[in-house]
Amino acid sequence: LTASAFASFSLSMIISRFTADALMDRFGAAKVVFYGGVVGGAIWSASILIAVPLSQTASQTNNLLALVLINIGFFAAGAGIVPMFPAFIVGAAKVPGIPASLGIARISVISIAGYFLGPTVTGLISELTNLPTAFMYPGLALIVAGIAGRGLRDK
């Protein structure tokens, strides 16, 4: 059952990958990234804050509710993450005064750094506190990335 959160996250990313381009065409990349990041990060964080205490009770009903809430949180996080990288790549290519190749290279370096630093920081926080607290860090990072996405230019 614990793998269901990863399955929800992955399924959400697949669905969102097929719909994100249409949403960005209709509403603009800045709005999609902002709302995806802020709402996805907030739901993910809230699901952890609510579900973890619920799961620590002896009640089967509470454990099932906690499982459903965690899956909703991971699903929301997956949907919020997907449009970010393509939108930031396109945005980096449109920065005035910077060649598109340089902007894209910078975003790629930031992405690779996040790939290595994100899990490392999450693990460090987990060692210092506990795993539910550590999972608040990526939720916060998703919210920050969503806010940073407000600077994207749609035209």
Would you name each region that the model predicts?
Residues L1-F9, L102-R106:
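Loop-to-transmembrane helix entry
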Residues T2, V32, G103, I125, ...:
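Alpha-helical transmembrane segments of multi-pass secondary-active solute transporters
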Residues G139-K155:
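Multi-pass alpha-helical transporter architecture, strongest
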Residues A30-F88:
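C-terminal transmembrane helical hairpin of 12-TM major facilitator-type secondary transporters
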Residues S10-F18, Y115-F116:
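Residue-level signature of mid-helix packing/kink "hotspots" within the transmembrane helices
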Residues S16-A29, S126:
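Helix-to-loop junctions at the C-terminal end of transmembrane segments
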Residues F18-A22, T120, I147:
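Residue-level hotspots within transmembrane alpha-helices of multi-pass secondary transporters
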Residues P96-L131:
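A late C-terminal transmembrane helix in Major Facilitator Superfamily
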